[in-house]
């Protein structure tokens, strides 16, 4: 089985020209990290975790150190990870003061009998596991302070659009043993209510992985994704004989028509077919397979290069 990793950097509005190159570099870095793990014989779970950690560590993306701020000006992060081999999974929500929520989600998967920990319980577990705590203000960037100020101003003027300031990072992978996995991480929505939890940590919505079908990681308007169970819906269509591209189009189309939700997703099937699809304006993504790196941000704009 030829290994593959696909990553995304969130589906939302247009990305400014001054950010595109930095976003490009971040996506390539994450895909290269994930693929490097697979090429050395690592598992799909290792690969998706490694790729997402790279994105959480990049302030260009809405996860980890680039997370957007809630209405109190604080960072609250959500993340989940799933192993398609045995459907084991781990998730955390509303976590603060840690650099990499996806690592904590994996600890939930491997070190507890549970699938999901939140808020204070997740924080207590992180401390028990020796996860380093960092000051919350270290996760707050000037860019996200300005985004929060702008959102509050526009909300006061009743000009806000709940689907414009979105962002998530995610990865799916297929390893040489035929195992699939997904990982998804986010800071949520700008100016969200304290305690708001979106789709990213929710199995079946923010992602899903099953060796019998494939793996999906989603992005977009979290409430809409939750309502249609976007990740599992996409895998359902694959179960019914649809190609990965057809399945992605069907599920995203249903979310748009049924609840007017915009978003995107990445998919890898158990046979190694993959796709990146979105209905939002843009979605940075990258895929690494067979020594080639595929990358795009806007529709009909894909580049293919050799991997180092």
Swiss-Prot record:
Effect of residue 168 to A/C: Abolishes activation by autocleavage. Abolishes enzyme activity
Residues with the N-acetylmethionine modification: 1
EC number per UniProt: 3.4.19.5, 3.5.1.1
Keywords: Acetylation, Autocatalytic cleavage, Cytoplasm, Hydrolase, Protease
CC annotations in GO: cytoplasm; cytosol; nucleus; photoreceptor inner segment
Impact reported for residue 168 to S: Strongly reduced enzyme activity
PTM: Cleaved into an alpha and beta chain by autocatalysis; this activates the enzyme. The N-terminal residue of the beta subunit is responsible for the nucleophile hydrolase activity.
Location in the cell: Cytoplasm
Expression induction or repression: By 5-alpha-di-hydrotestosterone and progesterone.
Binding partners and assembly: Heterodimer of an alpha and beta chain produced by autocleavage. This heterodimer may then dimerize in turn, giving rise to a heterotetramer.
Family: Belongs to the Ntn-hydrolase family.
Free-text function comment from the UniProt entry: Has both L-asparaginase and beta-aspartyl peptidase activity. May be involved in the production of L-aspartate, which can act as an excitatory neurotransmitter in some brain regions. Is highly active with L-Asp beta-methyl ester. Besides, has catalytic activity toward beta-aspartyl dipeptides and their methyl esters, including beta-L-Asp-L-Phe, beta-L-Asp-L-Phe methyl ester (aspartame), beta-L-Asp-L-Ala, beta-L-Asp-L-Leu and beta-L-Asp-L-Lys. Does not have aspartylglucosaminidase activity and is inactive toward GlcNAc-L-Asn. Likewise, has no activity toward glutamine.
Protein name: Isoaspartyl peptidase/L-asparaginase
Annotated organism of origin: Homo sapiens (Human)
